[in-house]
Amino acid sequence: SIGRTIAATMYSNDIDVIFHASGPTGNGVFSEAKDLVSIEPDRDLWVIGVDLDQSAEGEVDIDGETRNINLTSTLKNTGNAIHSFSNTMMEEGFEPGIQWFNLANDGVGIAEGRLTDESLEVIEDYKQQIIDGDIEVPDAPE
């Protein structure tokens, strides 16, 4: 697959982490990383999943032990959007227009994955700064 080919090239050029954000093509990225760590168990290779927690996709058995090469996954919490929309429909009726889902209303996030507690604390701090408006994230390319 194209994902596997691209990942092989990146990993052969000493890239350790790939955030695939490529839909089904990402399966090839996971496959390549798992194959490489099966051959070289001491090598630290990671894949960052997209849209949902892809931890299950990152599992690989090495010498009878399960290892996971999924570092984390970015999450589109579409269930929260559907729940919010449904509640609004029932309580207020349908109102056309754009609705934004973001960190403040749990519309997006990340899976804990294999992130350290220290990393998660830093991420939570930045998340709160974004929610509070101390850090501005553009909603369109600049």
Predicted feature descriptions by range:
Residues 1-142:
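A residue-level marker of the well-folded mature domains of exported/periplasmic proteins
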